[in-house]
Amino acid sequence: MNTELDLQIACEFDNLPSEAQFALWADKALSQYRDESELTIVISDEAQSQQLNNDYRGKNKPTNVLSFEFEAPPGIDIPLVGDLVICPAIVLAEAIEQEKSFHDHFAHMVIHGCLHLLGFDHIKSEDAFEMESIEKQLLAELNIADPYRDEI
């Protein structure tokens, strides 16, 4: 693997994926675009997710994943890509609502967040199509079904 992961569990939650699973998912997304990567994933509760979402996005509710891209100062070349903050309570609620496995949806959120750290976005429809296509391809390589199958 070319990705060094710092996994920080900031809340208790049953049935979380293993650190090895998080590392595999992050590496799957990041190694397509970078030779080396360093990433922090924070597993947060709903209160922390809501606070960060409000502070950085102006949305006063918890969310599934927040991406905080690291931008090195000019002349500094380090492999740090940034931080993901993932709220397992939201990921679980979405997985149940969308009739997906918890771990499959978690894999999607890690890959989705990593792609944001690499500069991908889904605000414009053409950008969303590109990002979703990459997500579907990477998830398929992990034997995970198309997460957008119901949106066609």
Swiss-Prot record:
Binds 1 zinc ion. Its EC number is 3.1.-.-. InterPro entries: MetalPrtase_cat_dom_sf_prd, YbeY, YbeY_CS. GO terms for biological process: rRNA processing. Keywords: Cytoplasm, Endonuclease, Hydrolase, Metal-binding, Nuclease, Ribosome biogenesis, rRNA processing, Zinc. Its cofactor is Zn(2+). Zn(2+) binds at residues 112, 116, 122. The keyword Transport does not apply. SUPFAM superfamilies: Metalloproteases ('zincins'), catalytic domain. It holds the Pfam family YbeY. It is found in: Cytoplasm. Its main location: cytoplasm. Belongs to the endoribonuclease YbeY family. NCBIfam families: rRNA maturation RNase YbeY. Single strand-specific metallo-endoribonuclease involved in late-stage 70S ribosome quality control and in maturation of the 3' terminus of the 16S rRNA. This is Endoribonuclease YbeY. The gene is ybeY.
